[in-house]
């Protein structure tokens, strides 16, 4: 997998991490390797390019042995690169030796005496490994944009002493929760966005990343998806290359309710002193559902079939698309009959030729333009890859139904 996705981001799945996922911790404590592999597979199906793997717990002391067994299973059964997440360099090296390809190391920093970086840098040089480089220096976590840039420069310069190349640095610019209301962190999201811009300008051959959900930690569950999704949109605009998230928890930016979008952006950009209170009041007062989408997206049965088909592809509403496509074809044919067979609409056209022509028109006038809109939104950063893949699944189902009415050319 190329670290530089076009368009970005490279998605690093965060659920296989005992420090942040209750489910992952339960599976580790239960020695449930099958369950962990299943959790990994589900993230890949949801659109993750890579998987963060952390198995450390306070309840058990066999992190090295457990990590070694797990990454061996994952390497054999999951088609996705791994991100080895451990504070113990010995665990990282043991895991690296079990993986046929090149994993990402998570993470290096220069906290304290820099001993962690000193232990891992030779390993990175030996195996040619990239690493998430946290913007943490001798003075602690970098908070202002300039501090982030200065710390990244220190990380980079230190790495060069070990022979590390620019592409081996994935700078975590750090993001802090906006839920505390503390003045110290009121501009933290703005500083993160500006830090991304500054690092991308200074280190064009390196990469940037964020543990995105940190920005909303402590907010009501119903608000977190909105804040995370809005922040991701602006981070990508700033130049973010990779992101550590649960792809399932992201809402496409155009689908976020305008009022909720404004509340989130007021908080992220610290537009006024009541931004946090207003956001919390809105989400707690409205008792918004914690499951996500802020706009109810439905197909109106009264719409013409062309519009229904187009809408389903753009908005990833696969169920029912076959009938809508058949109806769209039928609307282009005179003297057509529609019957329902085994629960599906079937077209009975006067001739195969008329059905063929109508199917081609439907493809060119409805289905292909719908996928073009999806592609345009992807290119503009309004959609991330998992949503494009779901639209592609709708397109595939639509074309499979449409092909029944095409005349095969010998």
What do these predicted regions represent?
Residues 1-410:
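Domain-level signal for soluble alpha/beta catalytic cores
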């Amino acid at each position: 997998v190329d670290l530089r996705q076009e368009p970005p981001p490279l998605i690093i799945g965060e659920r296989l991490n005992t420090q942040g996922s209750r489910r992952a911790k339960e599976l580790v404590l239960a020695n449930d390797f099958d369950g962990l592999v299943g959790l990994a597979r589900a993230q890949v199906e949801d659109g993750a390019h890579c998987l963060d793997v952390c198995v450390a717990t306070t309840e058990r002391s066999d992190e090295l042995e457990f990590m070694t067994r797990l990454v061996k299973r994952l390497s054999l059964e999951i088609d996705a690169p791994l991100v080895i997440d451990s504070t113990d360099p010995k665990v990282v090296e043991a895991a690296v030796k079990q993986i046929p390809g090149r994993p990402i190391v998570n993470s290096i920093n220069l906290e304290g005496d820099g001993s962690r970086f000193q232990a891992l840098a030779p390993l990175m040089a030996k195996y040619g490994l990239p690493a998430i480089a946290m913007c943490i220096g001798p003075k602690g976590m970098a908070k202002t944009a300039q501090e982030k840039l200065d710390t990244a420069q220190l990380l980079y310069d230190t790495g060069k002493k070990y022979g590390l190349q620019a592409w081996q640095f994935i700078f975590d610019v750090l993001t802090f929760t906006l839920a505390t209301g503390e003045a110290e962190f009121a501009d933290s999201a703005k500083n993160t966005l500006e830090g991304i811009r500054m690092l991308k300008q200074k280190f064009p051959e390196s990469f940037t990343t964020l543990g995105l959900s940190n920005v909303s930690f402590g907010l009501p569950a119903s608000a977190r998806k909105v804040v995370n999704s809005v922040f991701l949109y602006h981070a990508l605009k700033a130049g973010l290359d990779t992101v550590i998230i649960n792809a399932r928890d992201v809402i496409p930016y155009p689908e976020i309710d305008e009022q909720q979008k404004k509340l989130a952006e007021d908080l992220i950009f610290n537009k006024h002193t009541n931004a946090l209170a207003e956001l919390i009041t809105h989400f707690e007062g409205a008792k918004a559902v914690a499951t996500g989408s802020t706009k109810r997206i439905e197909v109106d049965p009264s719409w013409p079939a062309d519009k229904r088909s187009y809408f389903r592809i753009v908005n990833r509403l696969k169920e029912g698309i076959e009938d809508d496509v058949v109806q769209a074809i039928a609307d282009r044919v005179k003297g057509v009959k529609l019957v329902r067979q085994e629960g599906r609409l079937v077209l009975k056209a006067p001739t195969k030729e008329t059905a063929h022509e109508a199917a081609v028109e439907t493809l060119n006038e409805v289905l292909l333009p719908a996928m073009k809109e999806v592609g345009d939104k992807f290119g503009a950063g309004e959609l991330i890859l998992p949503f494009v893949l779901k639209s592609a699944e709708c397109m595939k189902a639509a074309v499979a139904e449409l092909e029944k009415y095409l005349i095969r050319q010998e």
